[in-house]
Amino acid sequence: MTAQPYPVSEIVAAQRPHRRDAARNYDALLAAAREAFAENGAEASLEDIARRAGVGIATLYRNFPTRRHLFESVYADEVNELCRVAQDVAALEPWDALTSWLRRFVDYTVTKRAIREALNNESDVFLACRDSMYQAGGPLFERAQKAAEARTDISFDDLLRMVSGISSTYFPEETQRDRVLGVALDGVRTAR
């Protein structure tokens, strides 16, 4: 699978400042926001995010004029990474590539639940992220189907909705979530 630009890749590239010092601050803010949102949810303090990044609140607002801009930037950056993972796992056997990516997708969606819920599902950034995930994962699923390793009577949309349902469910232990995901994937795999 050759590297291809996804809609989200263009958004991430357009948002990131070109000056080295500004890019460093931007990256530090994204990392701090990821951490703060993971710990405190969507209501994490913007002042705390700026402090964690080692910048002033004015620098945060210069990069992200609103909380929504910050949510969208963190979300887009993470989806861009998820798309990169699809390219990385593409060299694996078809079923292994698909399941590796889907497991990463579940890990990603579980940790980004607060951000995802805070986003407007009709925003251009959200739609570009969704389209990018489909463009990244869809070929992995098609490859598994062509190799007769995945059922052909379901679509990638069906599969992603099922896996999204699992990732949006609260599990007291990660091992239980992994078991449930394994059972679901067994239902997608063709008989061997």
Regions found by a protein language model. Name each.
Residues 28, 48, 96-104, 158-162, ...:
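Amphipathic alpha-helical interaction segments
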Residues 37, 45-46, 57, 67, ...:
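Amphipathic alpha-helical segments enriched in hydrophobic/aromatic and basic residues
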